[in-house]
Amino acid sequence: MGTHEYEDDPRNSEVIISINGELLHRSEAKVSVFDAGFLLGDGVWESFRLHNGHLIFIDEHIERLFHGAETISMDIGKSKEEILSEIHRVIDANKMFDDVHVRLIVSRGLKPTPYQAPWVISSPPTIVIIPEYKKANVDRARDGITLVSVSTIRGGQNIQDPRINSLSKHNCIAA
């Protein structure tokens, strides 16, 4: 049990997702196996909540997204205003207002072949926006959680800067 638990919501089966500005039913939303995010974990992400019609701390999240992209020498290819506009468009398409978690993912884009060099890209960045209804698990909120320590630790800033929400989260998963 952890802090990321939420109550299942049947509306999520009908959620509309934005991929590069195209609105798709969740069952139709797909990203290429040649996407740098899939091949290499090459990209950045942010997640934030929609509460009573307001995107909580959205300016800070967008700023961190762009800072993370700049840190890994990735040009998002859109302005902050364009990204924010698309977030609102997908939320509006889903008629969402409250208890919503939004995941914004930006990868470096498509690669012509599985190759590590970040400059070998054949498309603009891939931008995915996934909004879902996620209300906190009331039992967990009431009962709290149990803290567990493990021997695997995350590396320091010289290994992977913890201030960047990088798609490559293996060090966090292992920890």
Q: What would you call each of these model-derived segments?
A:
Residues 1-175:
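Conserved alpha/beta cores of soluble small-molecule-handling proteins
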